């Protein structure tokens, strides 16, 4: 049973208010007000002089569980929202492996589930490790806002920079994965769809369905779920979803939305770290990690863990 061994995160110190992004993102004053007052997106983190490699290395530097165990790493996975995250031929994951002495590991990117790819990467890592005994996988997430598409989800969210690093093993006592559900919806194609608004109309019901699917697979009622760790798209989306499924919004960890924005696939790990730091999870607690990603189709994903 896949388990999280250790999680670390990194957020740049540079804070950029939403208002300061209006010019480059071509936002009207009304759109800025909508993001701040309605979606509760106040600022994002940026590191203008840093590279993606810098972001990932900073997260790994905080991963105490890796030190002295580099030889146990079998796989290094980079969960990406976008298939292309750096200009060719730059390869930050291979560079990271060289720097950290992980050249022996199989390193590759996981993508095409957009912002839900972080959950896919955990699942892939666990499946690979099932054949590797006591080996570990290093799952990385985080991207640079180096294109306009990587800065803004129109009318919905603003991307921020940051990164996470997670050690995964096939089985273990800490944060055991009980269930994973992923619903891939190819009809929600933002370029080829005859009805571009269909994704927005069905977003809440689709995300609710996958959360309930994962909970059912884990034989867990929502009343037994201590916490939901969301993707940080905005606050109002989760308020609506909670009303739909009858789950208390107070048990959805949304504190990082106003101060970090939507940090690509790293949201779940940032929120996990916050939950640990604040003592929101006790041994035996069950929690759900949920995310949705859109682009060439859409993916709605949820995982149930036991802390």
Predicted region positions:
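A short glycine/serine-rich beta->alpha loop
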Residues: 41-48, 81-82, 106-111, 150-153, ...
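Conserved beta-ketoacyl condensing-enzyme motif
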Residues: 4, 50-113, 220-238, 244
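Short beta-strand segments
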Residues: 111, 137-143, 168, 289-292
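Short, well-ordered amphipathic alpha-helical segments that serve as non-catalytic structural scaffolds
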Residues: 51-67, 202-218, 270-275
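Acyl-CoA/ACP chain-elongation machinery
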Residues: 141, 187-189, 235
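Flexible, glycine-rich active-site loops centered on histidine and acidic residues
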Residues: 130-162
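Claisen-condensing/thiolase-fold acyl-transfer catalytic domains that form or cleave C-C bonds
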Residues: 84-90, 103, 111-133, 227-307
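Condensing-enzyme catalytic core mediating Claisen C-C bond formation in acyl metabolism
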Residues: 1-50, 151-213, 302-307
């Amino acid at each position: 049973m896949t388990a999280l061994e250790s999680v670390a995160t990194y957020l740049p110190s540079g804070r950029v208010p939403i208002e300061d992004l209006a010019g480059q993102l071509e936002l009207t004053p009304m759109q800025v007000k909508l993001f701040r007052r309605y979606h509760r997106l106040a600022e994002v983190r940026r590191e203008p002089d840093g590279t993606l490699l810098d972001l990932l290395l900073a997260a790994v530097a905080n991963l105490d569980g890796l030190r002295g165990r580099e030889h146990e790493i079998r796989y290094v996975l980079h969960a990406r929202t976008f298939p292309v995250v750096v200009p060719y031929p730059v390869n930050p994951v291979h560079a990271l492996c060289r720097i950290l002495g992980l050249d022996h590991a199989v390193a590759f990117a996981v993508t095409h589930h957009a912002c839900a790819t972080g959950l896919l990467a955990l699942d892939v890592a666990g499946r690979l490790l099932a054949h590797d005994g006591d080996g570990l996988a290093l799952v990385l997430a985080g991207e640079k806002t180096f294109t306009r598409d990587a800065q803004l989800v129109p009318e919905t969210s603003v991307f921020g920079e940051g990164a996470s690093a997670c050690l995964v093993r096939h089985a273990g006592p800490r944060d055991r994965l009980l269930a994973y559900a992923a619903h891939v919806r190819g009809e929600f194609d933002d370029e080829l769809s005859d009805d571009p608004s269909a994704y927005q109309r069905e977003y809440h019901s689709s995300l609710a369905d996958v959360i309930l699917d994962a909970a059912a697979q884990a034989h867990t009622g929502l009343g037994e779920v201590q916490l939901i760790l969301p993707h940080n798209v905005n606050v109002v989306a989760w308020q609506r979803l909670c009303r739909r499924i009858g789950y208390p919004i107070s048990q959805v960890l949304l504190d990082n939305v106003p101060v970090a924005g939507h940090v690509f696939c790293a949201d779940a790990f940032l929120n996990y770290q916050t939950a640990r730091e604040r003592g929101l999870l006790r041994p035996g607690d069950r929690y759900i990690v949920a995310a949705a990603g859109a682009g060439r189709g859409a993916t709605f994903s949820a995982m149930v863990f036991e802390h």
